[in-house]
Amino acid sequence: MAAKVDLGKSPAEAPFKHWPIKGPEVSVEYRDDGCILLRSKHAVGPEPRSIAHLFVTQASTFPERPFLNQRLAGRGPWRSITYGEALRAARGIAQYLIERNLSAEDGVMVLSSNSIEHALVALGCYLSGVPVIPISPAFSLLTGDHGRLRHCFNATRPRIIFAQSGSTFAGALATLRDLDATLTFVTAQDHGPDSLVLDALIETEPTGAVASALERVGPNTVAKYLFTSGSTGMPKAVPQTHGMMTALVAGLEGLNLPESEDPSVVRRTLEWMPWSHISAGNVGFNGVIASGGTVFLDDGKPMPGLFEITMRNLREVQPVVFGSAPIAFGMLAAAMENDVELRQAFFKNMQYMAYGGATLSNDIYDRLQALAVLETGQRIPLTTMYGATETQGISMTHWVTERVGLIGLPLPGLVMKLVPNGSKLEVRVKGATVMPGYLGDPEKTAAAFDQEGFYKLGDAVRFVDDKDPTQGLVFDGRVVEDFKLDSGTWVSVGVLRPAIVAACSPNVLDAIITGQDQPFVGALLWPSAAALEQFRHSDGGPAHEALKAAIRANLAQYNATAKGSSRRIERFAILREPPSFAIGEMTDKGYVNQRLALECRASAVASLYQNPPPADVVIVQ
């Protein structure tokens, strides 16, 4: 097993670092139909008219403060743009869009990943009232037929296409050119013969038309279209109004204590998660603007060969806040257990950490806190926000807790409804952060809401303590991922997966849970890089056999205390190929799409249930 840090004493004895935020206060209404309604007792904070207005205010307040930082090509030094510079550039882009007669009925599609230029295009759209449409770069780069790119284009029909590099996105640009010959293409570098240079848009002299356009931007103005992950079909286009986004800003502001605003501390973050999704594109991006913070764009990812870049950036940035998917925290814990300098840099300024997209395992949480105590003498608050593309963030763990797996309590201004669904409680929500409906799809819109207008998220939750709702809600699995064994016993994938990862830590990075209509639960496991390295140098037999033996021992120990067939892992196999970004097994938010992974690994799944099993399948017992 890979080495762990020896603290000498339990980190649970250490205090938490002070986190100036209001604690949990919730009103609970129990209805005769079995539904439970939850509301925060905290009032919402001040709400800006739009994100565009908010950015103008912050740029006027902090004109010289760095807003965005990005490395120059070739892992060079950081280049930076201030709030004031970003506003001047965005106004130029807005003027160009106005001169081209673009309106709220049109759009600017962004094909490429996070960049300073991407942000400027988005802000220019906000100021002019033209929707921006950021899509996953994978739709352009990792699929040969560009099926999802075509789908997103046809759903929104933008008039302008932006890509960071004309050469990198040449294939996607050609596909779109064939779809619509009237499109305007804009690139920041490696320009093609028929593309405009973004600098030309930025240098457009703004007139009073920009201010007039901003006056027309309000809560009901569509700021952007985001696409769902498409785990159950083609991605759906979700309008993101300014009111949806500012309602989230106001809800979060309602939780801040007066002492939260320390002018000497600038919220400095390192961001790799994509702006084509809610977490980074709305919660993170708008949150940084609201706090007057500074973003460093991370060109690394939680993938072998790329996480080393993230570690280098963490050493330099020394962030105040760090948020990511659980997979990144697992890799980070393993790295810091063997790298003192990284640990020192990571915790030097850290005020709190945040995770989302999937459940963090208890083991990773314990290891992170052990490292924090070793470095600072304190535990660091770790929060999570729960929501969806259709809802923004709707709940948050806004208090210090020693548990993981919580989704917190509803944010101020929202109503959460818990609906009995078998033995579970299904989550639904109503409020200003929720979408008005899918673009051009009234049937899916109607199916997404119940008769009272609550959006149905498809997840299940339970109270930490039924007698004390202020302890919050625990994620209890995704209803659409749960399945039955052939005995009729339900298996909760969202609960079981992190439990298995924790039981096998640090040998396993992630897991696919199997067993629908089968006699037992199985698992396909991705080994961690640390485990592969450790067992490559192990004594005795081949490294792969030693790793299988170690994981078998982990699972045997786990099974000894697991209650019932729905919690036990009877067989497993180790996956040699990492989850694929190209086909969507691994989303660009950094979590595994269980449904798609099961389809893509169908032969491996089937092998778990062969009798006798093949050599690569391990029986735990």
Show which residues each predicted segment covers.
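Structural core segment of the AMP-binding/adenylate-forming
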Residues: A2-W19, L127-L201
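Conserved AMP-binding/adenylate-forming core of the ANL superfamily
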Residues: A43, E64, L68-L120, S140-R150, ...
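Conserved pre-ATP/AMP-binding loop-to-beta segment of ANL
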Residues: P63-P66, F185-A188, G192-P193, A200-F227, ...
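Conserved AMP-binding A3 loop
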Residues: R79-G84, L214-R216, A223-A250
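Conserved structural elements of the adenylate-forming
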Residues: L87-I93, T204-G208, P219, V238-E261
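Conserved AMP-binding/adenylation subdomain of ANL enzymes
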Residues: T246-R268, W275-E341
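Gly/Ser/Thr-rich phosphate-binding loop
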Residues: S291-G293, M311, V320-G323, A333-V404, ...
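Conserved ATP-binding/catalytic segment of the ANL
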Residues: L425-L485, V617-I619
